[in-house]
Amino acid sequence: MSNGLFQSIKENVVFVVVCIVIALALFLIAYAAEKYVVRRDGIKERILNTRKVAMIGLFSALAVILHVMDFPVPFAPPFYKLDFSEIPALLGTFAFGPVAGVMIEFCKILLKLLVKGTSTAFVGDLANFVIGCSFILPASLIYLFKKTKSRAIVGCVSGTLIMTVFGTAFNAIYLLPAFSKLYGMPLDSIIAMGAEINGGVTGLVSFVCLCVAPMNLLKGT
């Protein structure tokens, strides 16, 4: 499996670099937000310590188990898979902060690649990571500023809506064109796959609205 993974990395090195840059950017956003709250509240505990790192490993393991148990959905082409790995990621984020959440999401994808490799030239893996972060980061930031049950609920609802809007737009603007280019598959062919499932799909916008958005809503609920 490792040889296949290294071969995939060599074949898609530019895209892999883009993935790493995006991951670093999300980590820095989470770190800056958490650092602000730590200073504001006078919290002396470090953002990352031995206990947190151990718990990040535990939640990452739970997340990757749920991630590899993904399954296709009837309203989208078969390369779209639904999983519930955001549950342990969200719990870890609420418990230990947004930096821990981003690290859980990253470790989940890294472990999955080591176990199963990639079947989408890393496009699906980037999508899962970035869209997952678009859910847990808003949710955790809303909760972080005032840790109450109502804020947690508001955070989850807001995170779901943001993930749905962002995930839909990210698919249309970047992920689907990247998938099309990496696999040499015309974008129209991908849209046609959606049209076979749902007659309402007539173009890229209707594809992401009818095939991608419902899946992101399900992930958040």
Model-identified regions with their sequence ranges:
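Loop-helix junctions at membrane interfaces
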Residues: 1-221
